[in-house]
Amino acid sequence: MSVDLATVKRVAKLARIAVSEDEANRMVGELNGILGFVEQLSEVNVDGVEAMTSVTPMAMKKRADEVTDGNKAADIVANAPVTDHNFFLVPKVVE
């Protein structure tokens, strides 16, 4: 897979990021380099290799899940300009 200039410009537009022509050209090379590295990783034979989350074995401390509302709704919306029944009200952005 490779990225072309049109793809970089399209992604920048979708992300609403201003990208100059020079930056877009530079990003094409950088993104293609990253994708090339990812393709190299996908070619590595990992048959028989056990999945791991860390280089060194670590045990995570666990706690029992408890469902609560946190009792902080009023604190959370206290600085919001407009709220209704502890919900944030925001302007409509999609027509």
Curated annotation (Swiss-Prot):
InterPro entries cross-referenced by the UniProt entry: Asp/Glu-ADT_sf_sub_c (IPR036113), GatC (IPR003837)
Gene3D superfamilies: Glu-tRNAGln amidotransferase C subunit, N-terminal domain
EC number: 6.3.5.-
Enzyme category, top tier: ligase
Domain of life: Bacteria
Protein biosynthesis as UniProt keyword: yes
UniProt GO BP: glutaminyl-tRNAGln biosynthesis via transamidation; regulation of translational fidelity; translation
Substrates-to-products reaction catalysed: L-glutamyl-tRNA(Gln) + L-glutamine + ATP + H2O = L-glutaminyl-tRNA(Gln) + L-glutamate + ADP + phosphate + H(+); L-aspartyl-tRNA(Asn) + L-glutamine + ATP + H2O = L-asparaginyl-tRNA(Asn) + L-glutamate + ADP + phosphate + 2 H(+)
Pfam families: GatC (PF02686)
Family of this protein: Belongs to the GatC family.
Physiological role: Allows the formation of correctly charged Asn-tRNA(Asn) or Gln-tRNA(Gln) through the transamidation of misacylated Asp-tRNA(Asn) or Glu-tRNA(Gln) in organisms which lack either or both of asparaginyl-tRNA or glutaminyl-tRNA synthetases. The reaction takes place in the presence of glutamine and ATP through an activated phospho-Asp-tRNA(Asn) or phospho-Glu-tRNA(Gln).
Subunit structure: Heterotrimer of A, B and C subunits.
Record's protein name: Aspartyl/glutamyl-tRNA(Asn/Gln) amidotransferase subunit C
Species this protein is from: Rhizobium etli (strain ATCC 51251 / DSM 11541 / JCM 21823 / NBRC 15573 / CFN 42)
Species lineage: Bacteria, Pseudomonadati, Pseudomonadota, Alphaproteobacteria, Hyphomicrobiales
The encoding gene: gatC
